[in-house]
C-alpha cells in the first residue's frame, strides 16, 4: 500500500503457508536490524492479545456487546470452516514503543504481509472503483459497490507518548476495491484524513503462489497541537484492519481447502501469516534492502486448538472436455484438453476444493506423433524459469500449443500463454521425465505468471499418454485449457477407430477427500482422405504397398536389393513381413563376420545418438541401410538405421539385424533392434525372410510407421538369379489387426513383387563332370561292389544348373539287397535319420560361403519304385539335393531336379563300396571301357548332353585308367 506525501500507513494480512516459513527461515541473518526492531514483541508459540503481530479470520467483527475483540487470544471467535467465506478477516500490528507512555521506537516505512498458501482474496467478488473516482473522493466508490472493509488507526507522538488520532479516538475509515494499475492483480484503497492510502497486492509465482501485500509508508506529516507543543510528528502506533470476507457476491475471502489433519496443523505453520517491517532509520543505512534485510519475519499462527473444519463436505466436481479437432482417425490432431472446476458462489457455501494433482489420460491409440519432431527443439529447466521471476526463454521451436486459464479473481481471458516441450531427462517413458510439457500462462495486465510442469508418462507397449500436474498451486481456477498445435507437425495423432474414444482422469483435491474421475468421450467419423470410419481395431483397412527388386536385373550379377513397404494413414500398423524371395536371389556371405548377440544386446541398451555415432556392431558386418518414415500427416519423420548380418536366430541359420537409432528431433528414445530370421528352403535354396514384430510403439512414442525402406547395398552381397523365367517375391505383410500388441491378433495381406532377369541368355553353361570307381583290381570283377565318386566342376559367371541327370553304364547295376535301412519321412523331417541309412558322403564348394558344405548321403522314403537319394549338405547354411533313382533300359539313372540356382564351383559325391555299396558290377570292368550318359539343363534353359562320359576304373591294364572326356 502506498502512502502519498503526508499520509499515515497501516497494513492488513491474514496467514501464510509453512512453505514460506521454511524459505524465510533459511535466509542468512542480515547485518541489519530485523522486523523485531520496529514491531512490538510477538511470540508465535505463546500468542497474546497484545502481541505485536496477529492475524486471522473471525465469525464476528466488531464483537457482540461485552465480548472481547477477535484476536489470537479468542480462539472461539476464529472462523475454522475450510474452503468457505469467513465473516471477517483481520490483521493487527503494534509498533514497538517505549516510555514515556507509548512512544514508537521509530518511524515505520515499509510493511510486507504474506498470506497463507490457499487463502484467496477475490477482487472480482465485488465492484471495482475506478482510480479517478477514488482520487476525487473515496466516498464516490460506494456507488460501485466497492467497499470491502474498514481500517482503524491509532497514532502516537514521540513527545508526549500519548495515543492520538487525526480525530479524537481511533480513526475508522472504509476500504475500497480499486481497479489496479497495469501489472497489479489487485489494489485496495482508503482515504484517511483527506489522504489516499493503497494496498498493492501480488502473487508469489516464483514460489508457492501465495498472495501478499506491500505498503510503502512515507514520512509522517507534522500535527499541530495546542501551545506550547506546537507542531509535532504523529507516528503510527497501532493498526487494525478488518475485511468483510463476504463482501459482494459473498466470496471475497475464501479460506484454504487444505486439510492435512489437526496434528499437522498444530505442529506446523501451514495457516500462519507473516509480517516484515522496517523503519526509515533502518532503511537509511547503506546497503539496506527491503524486504530482504528485514528477515526473519514475524509469524502469526492460528490459535492453539483451532484447525480447518468441515473438510469432508468440501465440494469437488471437476469436469473434462477433450476435442481432437479432427474428424479423421489416425491423423494429425491439434487436440484441446480442458479441465474445469466449478466456482461456487454464495456467502454460506463452501467453494470447490483447489486441485492438488490433475492426471489426464488420453484414449489408447491417441499418442505422440513423430512428425512433430521435424524442426522441434526443447526447452531447458533454466530457460523455462519455473520458480523464478526470470523471463521465460524457451526457444520458439519448442512451442507446441497454447494455454488459457480462467480464475475467479481475474476477468476471463486474462491469463494465457504458451505450451513448450521440456528437455528430455530420462529414457524411461513411464518416468514422466522423458516427455514433459511446460505451461507458461501470464497476465501482463494483472502481473501474474503461472508456470507449471506437466509430466507425461507413456505406456511403453501401447503408447497411451498420461499427463500429470502434481502439487499444483493452491490457486482457484474454473478452467484450464491446453490447445496443442495441429497441422503437418501436430504433436498428437488421433485415435485409430471411430470410438467412442474416452479420455479419463484422476483429479485429487487439496481437501484430502477422494479423487474425482471425470471422463470425456469423443467420436471420429472418417478415414483420412475419405471412407467409412472403422468401428473396431480389426475393422481397419490394411492394404500395404510392397516392392522388392534389385537396382539391376542382369542375370547372375551382383546388385543392391531394395525393399519398400508402405501404408496410408488410417490403415493398420505395419507389424512385419514373411517373404519368400525368388529362387537364385541370394547373398554372398563369404568374408562377412556376424554381428554377435552381445553386440546386438549392447545396441538395444544404448542411446540412439551414441549408437548413431559408434555402432555396437562391427563395420565389417554391415550389409545395408534402412529408412523408417514415422508419423501421421503429410510430412512423416525420416529415421535412419543400419542393417547388419547376424547369426542363427529363431531356428534360422542366420539373420539380419536392423539397428535403428531412435532419435526424433531433440529426443533420444534409445535404439530399436529388429531381427529378420533368414531361413533357407533346403531343396531350392530360396531365402525365406521372417521379421520380428516391428514395434508400433517405441520409447512410449506411437510410431505410426508409414514406410519402411531397406537397401542391401554392400558391394557384391546380393546376387541375381541366372534363370530366365518370370519370378516373384511372395509372402505376407503383417498388420496390427485387432491388437497390435498381440502377434496372435495380427492380420495378413498377401504381397507379390514380380521379377525377371535380363541378359540371362548371354550366360554360358559349361560345367564338367568326372566319374570314377575306387578299389583294388579285385573291385573291378563281376559281382563286386566298388566305391563310386562323381566330381562336378563349374565355371564362375556361367548359368547355374537347374536339372542334372546321370545314367550309369550297363556295367553298374543297383544292388537292391544292400538297401537295408531307409530314412523315413518322419525321421527326415525331424533330422533324425538313422546312421544305417547313410550310403555315401558329399561336399560342395560355393563362392558365396567361406567354408564348404558337407554331409551324408541317405536313402530316403519316396513315392517312386526305388528310394530317393538325399544329399544332406550342412554348414553355414543347409541344402538338400534329392535324386530320384530309377532303372531305364537296364541302366541306373539318377535325376536331381530341382537344383538350386546358386553358384557351385565344385561338388563331390562319394558313394560307399563293399557291404554298403549300392553299385554291383555286372561284368568285369577291365574287359571294355564303361561310359555314362550326362544330361544337364541350365537355369537359362541351355543344355549340356554327353552320351559317352567315361567312367574311370582302377587297376585295368589296357583301358581301365582311361580318363575319358572332360
In which residue ranges do the predicted regions lie?
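Sec-dependent, cleavable N-terminal signal peptides
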Residues: 1-33
Amino acid at each position: 500500500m502506498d502512502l502519498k506525501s503526508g499520509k499515515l500507513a497501516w497494513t492488513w494480512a491474514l496467514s501464510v503457508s509453512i512453505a514460506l516459513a521454511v524459505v524465510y527461515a533459511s535466509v542468512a541473518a542480515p547485518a541489519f536490524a530485523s522486523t523485531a526492531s520496529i514491531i512490538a514483541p510477538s511470540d508465535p508459540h505463546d500468542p497474546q492479545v497484545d502481541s505485536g503481530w496477529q492475524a486471522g479470520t473471525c465469525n464476528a467483527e466488531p464483537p457482540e456487546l461485552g465480548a472481547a475483540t477477535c484476536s489470537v487470544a479468542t480462539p472461539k471467535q476464529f472462523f475454522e470452516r475450510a474452503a468457505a467465506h469467513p465473516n471477517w478477516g483481520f490483521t493487527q500490528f503494534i509498533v514497538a514503543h517505549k516510555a514515556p507512555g507509548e512512544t514508537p521506537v521509530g518511524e515505520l516505512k515499509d510493511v510486507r504481509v504474506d498470506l497463507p498458501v490457499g487463502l484467496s482474496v477475490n477482487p472480482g467478488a465485488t465492484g471495482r472503483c475506478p482510480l479517478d473516482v477514488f482520487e476525487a473522493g473515496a466516498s464516490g466508490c460506494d456507488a460501485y459497490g466497492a467497499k470491502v472493509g474498514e481500517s482503524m488507526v491509532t497514532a502516537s507522538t514521540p513527545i508526549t507518548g500519548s495515543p492520538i488520532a487525526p480525530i479524537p479516538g481511533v480513526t475508522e475509515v472504509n476500504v475500497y476495491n480499486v481497479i489496479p494499475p497495469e501489472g497489479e492483480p489487485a489494489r485496495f484503497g482508503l482515504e484517511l484524513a483527506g489522504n489516499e492510502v493503497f494496498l498493492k497486492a501480488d502473487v508469489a509465482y516464483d514460489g508457492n503462489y501465495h498472495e501478499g501485500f506491500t505498503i510503502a509508508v512515507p514520512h509522517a506529516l507534522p500535527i499541530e497541537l495546542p501551545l506550547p507543543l506546537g507542531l509535532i510528528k504523529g507516528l503510527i502506533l497501532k493498526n487494525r484492519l478488518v475485511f468483510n470476507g463476504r463482501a459482494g457476491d459473498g466470496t471475497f475471502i475464501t479460506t484454504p481447502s487444505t486439510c492435512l489433519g489437526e496434528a499437522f496443523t498444530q505442529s506446523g505453520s501451514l495457516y500462519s501469516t507473516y509480517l516484515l517491517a522496517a523503519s526509515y532509520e533502518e532503511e537509511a543505512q547503506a546497503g539496506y534492502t527491503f524486504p530482504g534485510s528485514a528477515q526473519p519475519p514475524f509469524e502469526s499462527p492460528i490459535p492453539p486448538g483451532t484447525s480447518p473444519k468441515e473438510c469432508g463436505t468440501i465440494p469437488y466436481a471437476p469436469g473434462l472436455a477433450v476435442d481432437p479437432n479432427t474428424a479423421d482417425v489416425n491423423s494429425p490432431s491439434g487436440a484441446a484438453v480442458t479441465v474445469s472446476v466449478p466456482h461456487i458462489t454464495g456467502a454460506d457455501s463452501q467453494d470447490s476444493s483447489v486441485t492438488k494433482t490433475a492426471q489426464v489420460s488420453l484414449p489408447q491409440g491417441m499418442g505422440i506423433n513423430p512428425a512433430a519432431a521435424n524442426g522441434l527443439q526443447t526447452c531447458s529447466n533454466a530457460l523455462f524459469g519455473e520458480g523464478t521471476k526470470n523471463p521465460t526463454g524457451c526457444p520458439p521451436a519448442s512451442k507446441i500449443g497454447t494455454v488459457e486459464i480462467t480464475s475467479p479473481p481475474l476477468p476471463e481471458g486474462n491469463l494465457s500463454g504458451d505450451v513448450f516441450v521440456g528437455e528430455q531427462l530420462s529414457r524411461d517413458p513411464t518416468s514422466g521425465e522423458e516427455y514433459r510439457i511446460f505451461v507458461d500462462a501470464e497476465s501482463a495486465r494483472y502481473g501474474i505468471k503461472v508456470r507449471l510442469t506437466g509430466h507425461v508418462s507413456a505406456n511403453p507397449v501401447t503408447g497411451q499418454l498420461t499427463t500429470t500436474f502434481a502439487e499444483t498451486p493452491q490457486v482457484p481456477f474454473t478452467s484450464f485449457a491446453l490447445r496443442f498445435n495441429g497441422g503437418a507437425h501436430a504433436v498428437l495423432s488421433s485415435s485409430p477407430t471411430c470410438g467412442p474414444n474416452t479420455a479419463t482422469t484422476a483429479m485429487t483435491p487439496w481437501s484430502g477427500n477422494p479423487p474425482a474421475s471425470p471422463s470425456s468421450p469423443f467420436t471420429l467419423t472418417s478415414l483420412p482422405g475419405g471412407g467409412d470410419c472403422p468401428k473396431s481395431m480389426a475393422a481397419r483397412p490394411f492394404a500395404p504397398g510392397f516392392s522388392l527388386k534389385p537396382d539391376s536385373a542382369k542375370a547372375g550379377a551382383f546388385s543392391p536389393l531394395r525393399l519398400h513397404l508402405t501404408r496410408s494413414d488410417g490403415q493398420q500398423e505395419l507389424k512385419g513381413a514373411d517373404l519368400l524371395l525368388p529362387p537364385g536371389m541370394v547373398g554372398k556371405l563369404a568374408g562377412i563376420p556376424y554381428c554377435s548377440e552381445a553386440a546386438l544386446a549392447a545396441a538395444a541398451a544404448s542411446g540412439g545418438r551414441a549408437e548413431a555415432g559408434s555402432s555396437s556392431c562391427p563395420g565389417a558386418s554391415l550389409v545395408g541401410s534402412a529408412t523408417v518414415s514415422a508419423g501421421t500427416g503429410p510430412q512423416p519423420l525420416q529415421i535412419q538405421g543400419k542393417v547388419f548380418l547376424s547369426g542363427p536366430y529363431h531356428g534360422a541359420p542366420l539373420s539380419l539385424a536392423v539397428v535403428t537409432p531412435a532419435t526424433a528431433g531433440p529426443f533420444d528414445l534409445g535404439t530399436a533392434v529388429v531381427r529378420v530370421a533368414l531361413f533357407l528352403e533346403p531343396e531350392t535354396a530360396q531365402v525365406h525372410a521372417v521379421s520380428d514384430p516391428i514395434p508400433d510403439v517405441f520409447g512410449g512414442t506411437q510410431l505410426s510407421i508409414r514406410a519402411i525402406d531397406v537397401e542391401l547395398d554392400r558391394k557384391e552381397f546380393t546376387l541375381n538369379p541366372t534363370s530366365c523365367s518370370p519370378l516373384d517375391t511372395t509372402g505376407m505383410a503383417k498388420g496390427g489387426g485387432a491388437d497390435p500388441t498381440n502377434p496372435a491378433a495380427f492380420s495378413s495381406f498377401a504381397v507379390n513383387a514380380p521379377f525377371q532377369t535380363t541378359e540371362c541368355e548371354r550366360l554360358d553353361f559349361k560345367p564338367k563332370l568326372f566319374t570314377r570307381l575306387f578299389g583294388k583290381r579285385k573291385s573291378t570283377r563281376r559281382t563286386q561292389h566298388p566305391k563310386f565318386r562323381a566330381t562336378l566342376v563349374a565355371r564362375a559367371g556361367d548359368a547355374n544348373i537347374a536339372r542334372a541327370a546321370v545314367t550309369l553304364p550297363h556295367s553298374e547295376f543297383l544292388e537292391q539287397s544292400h538297401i537295408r535301412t531307409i530314412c523315413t519321412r518322419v525321421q527326415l523331417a525331424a533330422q533324425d535319420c538313422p546312421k544305417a541309412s547313410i550310403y555315401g558322403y558329399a561336399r560342395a564348394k560355393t563362392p558365396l560361403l567361406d567354408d564348404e558344405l558337407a554331409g551324408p548321403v541317405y536313402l530316403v522314403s519316396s513315392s517312386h519304385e526305388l528310394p530317393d537319394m538325399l544329399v544332406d549338405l550342412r554348414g553355414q547354411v543347409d541344402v538338400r539335393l534329392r535324386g530320384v533313382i530309377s532303372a531305364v533300359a537296364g541302366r541306373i539313372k539318377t535325376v536331381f531336379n530341382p537344383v538350386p540356382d546358386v553358384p557351385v564351383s565344385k561338388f563331390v559325391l562319394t558313394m560307399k563300396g563293399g557291404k554298403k555299396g549300392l553299385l554291383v558290377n555286372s561284368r568285369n570292368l577291365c574287359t571294355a571301357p564303361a561310359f555314362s550318359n550326362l544330361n544337364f539343363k541350365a537355369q537359362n534353359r541351355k543344355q549340356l548332353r554327353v552320351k559317352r562320359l567315361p567312367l574311370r576304373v582302377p587297376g585295368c591294364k589296357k583301358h581301365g585308367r582311361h580318363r575319358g572326356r572332360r
